[in-house]
């Protein structure tokens, strides 16, 4: 599906089709593992022009959907995109790379390795102005007033974004370990491009390398096991590492920025989408949109995953600890420990 558009969405929100196509073709870019990368020069040409646009006040208060991949972030973003005031960007990595090349951690556009964790000091000259210029141009073009920027790894860049924007807000989306790990593993196997060595972990494993080198040493559960983690090769183990460090980091951000970070559990979103979507709207300063809420009830469904992933004993122990912190008491029972 182009721009995550399907028949139901197009039928329910015909006026939103242009906004999604605009974001898809001119803001987001086509990263590694995706088709249509030949269009990227057009995207970058537009971004360079849009970045020079005059900024408006609404560009200072984007809402970021963060967490880890395969946790329901895309479907949440698409439901929020149905809100009359929202422009949804689905991992606009072309825009972020153009503003600061260190953003690219998977190797879609940069030959040089990026930064997984970014702080205020990592802002480069003109970066904030360029992003807000693109946001402003996009909001004016689409007649909306709130950017919803889904980019899971921005979880590791809250300091950076709080320095960049006056009033950013963050959704920390969590999903239980077993389902997330199984879903990530399945995606990797399905989408791997052997010829160019591209998969979930970037070009030639760049994302995995940076995760191990830059994030794991700072994690409270895995920092004493860096060499063990470095030697892991199974997809379920690597997915488990990403889940552990992402969830731990997200919990820290809630404590550090209690007024700026809202935790949403994927399971709660599936169980009562009305309540959770209204929480998000209230948090982001968006008015209630009944059509969006109805679409959420129709669209957000729990995906049952029957594959129970096998992980290294060190990771299994860490998963138990993190699951307890997150309130997922029974999740570890669905994790098989490698002998």
Per-range role (PLM):
Residues 63, 144-147, 169:
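Short active-site oxyanion
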Residues 78-159, 164, 193-231, 319-337:
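PAPS-dependent sulfation machinery
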Residues 65-80:
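Glycine-rich phosphate-binding P-loop
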Residues 67, 147-150, 172-174, 263-266, ...:
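Short beta-strand segments
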Residues 74-77, 95-98, 155-158, 178-183, ...:
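Short catalytic/ligand-binding loop motif for oxyanion handling, primarily in non-cytosolic enzymes
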């Amino acid at each position: 599906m182009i721009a995550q558009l399907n028949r139901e969405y197009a039928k329910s929100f015909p006026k939103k089709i242009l906004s999604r196509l605009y974001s898809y073709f001119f803001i987001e870019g086509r990263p590694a593992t995706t088709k249509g990368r030949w269009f990227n020069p057009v995207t970058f040409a537009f971004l360079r022009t849009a970045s020079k646009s005059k900024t408006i006040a609404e560009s200072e208060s984007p809402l970021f959907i963060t967490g880890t991949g395969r946790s329901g972030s895309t479907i949440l973003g698409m439901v929020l995109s149905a809100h009359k005031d929202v422009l949804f960007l689905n991992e606009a990595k072309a825009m972020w790379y153009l503003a600061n090349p260190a953003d690219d951690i998977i190797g879609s556009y940069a030959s040089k390795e990026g930064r997984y964790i970014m702080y205020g000091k990592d802002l480069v000259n003109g970066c904030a102005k360029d992003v807000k210029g693109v946001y402003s141009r996009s909001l004016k073009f689409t007649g909306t007033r709130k950017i919803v920027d889904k980019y899971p790894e921005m979880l590791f860049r809250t300091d950076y974004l709080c320095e960049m924007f006056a009033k950013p807000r963050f959704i920390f989306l969590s999903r239980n370990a077993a389902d997330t790990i199984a879903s990530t593993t399945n995606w990797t196997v399905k989408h791997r491009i052997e010829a160019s060595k591209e998969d979930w972990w970037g070009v030639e494993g760049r994302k995995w390398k940076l995760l191990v080198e830059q994030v794991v040493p700072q994690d409270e559960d895995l920092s004493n096991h860096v060499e063990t983690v470095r030697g892991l090769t199974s997809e379920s183990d690597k997915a488990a590492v990403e889940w552990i460090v992402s969830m731990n980091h997200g919990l820290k951000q809630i404590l550090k920025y209690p007024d700026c970070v809202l935790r949403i559990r994927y399971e709660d979103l599936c169980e009562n989408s009305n309540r959770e979507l209204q929480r998000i709207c209230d948090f982001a300063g968006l008015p209630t949109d009944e059509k969006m809420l109805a679409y959420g009830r129709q669209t957000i469904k729990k995906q049952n995953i029957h594959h129970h992933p096998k992980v290294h004993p060190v990771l299994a122990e860490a998963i138990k600890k993190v699951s307890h912190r997150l309130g997922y008491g029974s999740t570890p029972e669905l994790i098989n420990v490698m002998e």
